[in-house]
Amino acid sequence: MANEKKINAIADAEQAGLYYSSNTEEGFTREIKGETHSYLDSDGKPVKGKRDLKRIEEMRIPPAWTEVWICKEKNGHLQATGIDAKKRTQYIYHPIWTQLRSEAKFDKMSTFGRTLPKIREKYFEDLAYEGNKKQHDLPYERVMALIVRLLDTTFIRIGNETSRDDKEKATYGLSTMQDEHIDFEPTEITDEHDKWYDSQVGGKFTFVGKSNKKHEIEINDEEIPDLPALVMMCKDAKKGKSDDLFLFFDEDGNSQDVKAYHVNEYIQEISGEKFTAKDFRTWGGTKLAAEEISEFKKKDDKKQRKKNITKMVKGVAKRLGNTPAVCRGSYIHPRFINDYLKGSFFRLWKDTLGEQMYPLSESESHVIRYLENS
């Protein structure tokens, strides 16, 4: 699988006029003495070429990086690497490569939307699966379905263990959420005779996410009102064995904390596609943006349209827990913003009216047809 990805990446780079570079090949290095720095070639001699030096300076390689490697060629897809203060390898890519990767991510959004009914049908089924007696009503399938439902409705990041274990600035996502990050309270969202749990509860996540942003996200799910109760079951099932909130039990009754790779494997298994948890955030950002743009006044002039986009991006960024810049560049399909600013959005939006593709919402159905037709 890894070799196949590399072959595809090499082909993509060549098609874009780049070559697939690596920090294992000869390159330039950076030498820091006091408050000054210089760049050396593979023979240890100073780099003197004005174009090379200009290219390197434009990369804005952080001063704190150590073991800096810089590609000798201007068309390498990977332009520089270094080790940051937390001993992590960081990468700087060619702008064309970054744009290619971004476009590829957005290009699959219509396919993701078309696959969502299949994903939802399967996780709805798995949410009802209780496993055997040893699994305490929390088999792998049910817990994965629970987390994917949360991804689908809250757009919370999946998280990773490296960020969770950062002693200075620990941040969290769904797979790394701790017991302390969830609170429960009674709710009357479901009639008494429809309840399967002892008492109907609502839930709220309170945690610090990426970029040190504090999040408060409610999980009162009108379509699946017992979802918070499933989260409560996960919390209650551990009996102090772990601080991690989510866990599942295998067929022998052994518990295992949920990891991000478990969730991504489940998503790929039920979708039949190479989707990941992040695709739910990209889909969510795109859907929210399209919904808000569709509510703008059609007759707004160019100046007002720019203001509207700024307001919209800020709103979506707040919902996703991003900065507006990251939200616009990484989570909102650029076609909606570009078409709106050009004045063609409402015509294209009207042209894609059609029947609701259940279990997708009307706006989700609209977004898919827009991406496929425009």
For the regions a language model picked out, list residue spans one by one.
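Extended accessory and catalytic-adjacent subdomains in large enzymes
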Residues: 122-156, 160-374
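Surface-facing alpha-helical segments and adjacent helix-coil boundary elements at the starts of domains
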Residues: 2-198, 203-207, 216-218, 223, ...
